Design a protein with these regions (language model features):
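Catalytic-core segments of hydrolase enzymes
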Residues: 216-217, 240-242, 257-259, 266
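A metal-dependent hydrolase metal-coordination microenvironment
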Residues: 30, 54-205, 209-211, 218-231, ...
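Short glycine/proline-enriched coil/turn segments at helix->beta-strand junctions
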Residues: 135-139, 186-188, 237, 313-315, ...
């Protein structure tokens, strides 16, 4: 009777365990395999979240000093006391770099020779993320242009100690801009906002609140941003104008020798020149071929009256105040006086004549000495809260991607077991 019963099927065939059938390596040729979860999806998601975190939250939240126009019964005039000599400088010129992918068309030597031929004393070869010091005539100072982001928020770093390769790649908010300004300012002697108006790189709101920068290219070869300069000054931010060509082709006369800065320094030594820029002993010039047909002779304050004298006589001398409003214009003179009104918080001067347009730095009200602006401060509770929120969100996204990948893998395995 026992011999007539069919043998029990324990799942053992040809001496193999049924677990062996689940191994893709043991499957018969041509049989469907059971794919593993696609881990690359998880890794790709993790990388995307990391890049997004860097671009979105790799910075603190700041509290900015409230705009407060200059005030006081005294005046700070950057052009006093007198002394030193005037030097011609351009800190924004690009030479060939990075295998020709970016920057200028000419070599560093050619760029230096071009400016030397136009009588420049100082040149800054401000290539992107590259400091050049290759020539003594004209003096080449350590400078570079920082910025590789969709919003075109760029900086001109002069007297650079090192290159900051970090940047936020997307359109930057004001907190990201402040974070970069603080990093760049700590690694340089003079920090400028480059062409602030170009493609919305910086708004007038930004420059009126940001701290840790010395000035801006209110007038450059590619963009004029006087309204931005006046916005900062009207908010009580003492910022100097440093004009430059921003030339990418030194052989182009329409782009080279069209905007530069005159600096009154004790000597051509780099320390003296950078100190003069920081003090505001400069004025910007527009012209052609680097030719200076009219120059500032003096800018003095006495008993509430600002006196400007030029050599030779100017076509016009215009005094501009709070909000960028022209307060007074005088024509065909070599000397003009302006009496500060009670509501004048600052006055800056523009001079036209002999094929040039000059932009003087402002004289501002103060209670004594140079007015200082408080620095933006980190709001730690908001910053930590933001970081935690985005960390939780990022972990959730990565976990969801991992679960999705596992479900897809399980589905493929189940389908592979289904008899065809």
């Amino acid at each position: 009777m026992l011999d007539s019963m069919p043998p029990e099927d324990h799942g053992f065939h040809d001496g193999r365990s049924p677990l062996a059938d689940r191994s893709p390596e043991a499957a018969a040729p041509g049989a469907p395999t059971h794919p593993r979860p696609r881990r690359w999806i998880v890794w790709l998601t993790t990388a995307a979240v990391a890049i997004g975190a860097w671009a979105l939250v790799g910075y603190p939240i700041y509290e900015f000093p409230a705009p407060a126009p200059f005030r006081g019964t005294r005046f700070f005039n950057p052009y006093e006391p007198d002394g030193g000599r005037w030097l011609k400088a351009n800190f924004h010129a690009h030479a060939s770099a990075w295998l020709g992918i970016a920057d200028g068309r000419a070599s560093e030597s050619d760029v230096a020779r071009t400016y030397a031929a136009m009588g420049y004393d100082i040149v800054g070869l401000s290539n992107y993320w590259r400091i050049s010091r290759t020539h003594s005539v004209p003096r080449v100072y350590a400078a570079y242009e920082h910025g590789a982001n969709l919003g075109r928020s760029h900086h001109l770093v002069i007297g650079a100690h090192s290159v900051l390769a970090f940047d936020f790649p997307l359109v930057q908010n004001i907190h990201q801009k402040q974070f970069l300004l603080r990093l760049l300012h700590d690694a340089s002697e003079v920090l400028l906002i480059a062409h602030p108006r170009l493609r919305g790189g910086f708004s007038s709101y930004d420059v009126a609140r940001l701290t840790n920068y010395d000035g801006m290219e209110a007038v450059s070869g590619i963009r004029k941003s006087q309204e931005w300069w006046d916005a900062a000054l009207s908010a009580g931010r003492l910022r100097w104008n440093v004009s430059g060509d921003d030339s990418h082709d030194s052989s182009d006369p329409t782009a080279t020798g069209v905007c530069w800065t005159m600096i009154r320094a004790a000597s051509i030594a780099e320390s003296d020149v950078l100190a003069a820029i920081s003090q505001g002993l400069t004025y910007g010039v527009e012209g052609k071929g680097g030719r200076l047909g009219i120059a500032l002779d003096e800018c003095l304050m006495h008993d509430g009256t600002l006196r400007v004298r030029t050599v030779p006589a100017a076509s016009t001398i215009t005094f501009i105040g709070q909000g960028g409003v022209a307060r007074q214009t005088v024509a065909g003179v070599s000397q003009a006086d302006y009496v500060f009104r009670d509501d004048d918080t600052y006055i800056r001067v523009e001079i036209e004549g002999e094929g040039n347009h000059l932009y003087l730095n402002p004289v501002v009200r103060t209670d004594g000495g140079r007015p200082d602006t408080a620095e933006a401060r980190v709001n730690w509770p908001l910053s930590i809260g933001m970081w935690l929120s985005y960390t939780i969100a990022g972990v959730g996204i990565i976990a969801a991607a991992a679960r999705w990948s596992r479900r897809r893998a399980s589905g493929r395995m189940a389908r592979s077991r289904t008899p065809q």
